[in-house]
Amino acid sequence: MQIQPHIVYLAFSSHLKVGVTRKTQLNTRWIDQGAHEAMQLLEFPNRYLAGVAEVFLKKIFSDKTKWRKMLQNDFENIDWDIEREKALNYLPDDYKKYIVQNSKITRFNFPVLKIPKKVKSLNLLKEKIYKGVLKGIKGQYLIFEDDTVFNVRSNEGTKVQITMN
């Protein structure tokens, strides 16, 4: 069992989703997911309790990011106050003592000059050489001018050579 503080949160990337991460990794996690906005809900002393709370909340919130929608900024507006209350009211009473009081919305701006219209994923196993103009970075994705996107995280361990002009 990981005996370090863990946070259960709501993040808005392609849609509102629930997640859990170590307290020390919170902003890194949200940025990796391409979250535009995020908010802490609960703080637990260990991963196990946080995971149990997340399972409860997965009954009313997704725990997956729709990466294509996230990259295309294709999302609806949400009311954070309503969604937070919905989440907290759904939890069993014995979890209420873990609520993060006065939690604020954290907002992120990603450097994207061109939002892709039709996302094409770059697969380095199929396409050994790719040339493109970088137009943005969002979450773990590099976005190129021709709507090609490269998922850096899913290519961990792959040797890549980048040339800039």
Q: Where are the regions that the model predicts?
A:
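Non-catalytic accessory segments flanking enzymatic or RNA/DNA-binding domains
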Residues: 1-165
